[in-house]
Amino acid sequence: MAPGQPQAIPLRPEFILPQDGHTKQDCEIAAAKRWLEKNGATYSPLKATLLGDDLYSHQPFCRRTLRHDFHFIFVCKPDSHTTLYNWVNLLQSPHRRTLTTQVKVGAHFHPYTYRYANAVPLAEGADALTVNWFELTATDPEGKVLYRNGWVTDFPITDQNVPALAAAGRARWKIENENNNTLKTKGYHLEHNFGHGKKHLASLLAAMNILAFLYHTFLASPSPMKTISSSAPACPPAKPSSTTCAPHPLYPLSQLGCLVRLYAPRL
């Protein structure tokens, strides 16, 4: 997936299921780790960028993402990352920078304010992973806050690329609209009753629906092969993951590659 691109292409899913030899209940992070182990070698040559919510923006998973040669843009909330935000709040210019732009929304221009800082610790400790943090606050012309969110990434951040990084971070919601919503409301009937089968029935039915959606996405594309080939050289990754390998229409960060969102659909 990518900002400005209508398609969201599902990749091979990794289901949250009890694992052989494990006594603990399976979870989203454990499934994401398995997805990386199974699929990392396939997608890392695309220089793909993993998108995810605050669940993923913790040191062990960020390190694992980098070991598999992926980039990442993960949501980073103040309540769950107190060390990072304490560090950011102590920084002053030029180590913490602010950029304000005007974005046309309908008939009006809305102020978009970006704050960012490079090389801040993600956690406590001398061996803490250093990441780059950025935040977007969108307001209406009267100053009312319409949207605010923060992320961490391994991409170095500048005035030139921070708007595109924020657009990429926000693009993960395309999965809710173009993928999940379509599967649940547009004839695929991907619903909670898929969880009532025994053994592998639920996973099989869900996988068949995801595969059907993938084929329909390519068949609906004016040039299905161009969707793939045009992205390979500079293509902005998990559990069922979704991507459209396409150049970002807004900015020069071709190194973002494909954008792949890590998420757990609720069936």
Each predicted region: which residue ranges?
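Short, conserved catalytic/metal-binding motifs centered on acidic residues
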Residues: 32, 50-55, 72, 151, ...
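Hydrophobic, well-ordered secondary-structure segments
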Residues: 13-41, 73, 82, 88-102, ...
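Short acidic-glycine loop/turn motifs at beta-strand connectors
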Residues: 1-7, 140-144, 185
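An anionic, glycine-rich sequence signature occurring as long contiguous blocks
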Residues: 77-172
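A short, flexible helix-boundary coil/loop motif
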Residues: 100, 113, 184-267
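Conserved, well-structured functional cores that handle cations and Mg-NTP chemistry
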Residues: 1-63, 68-70
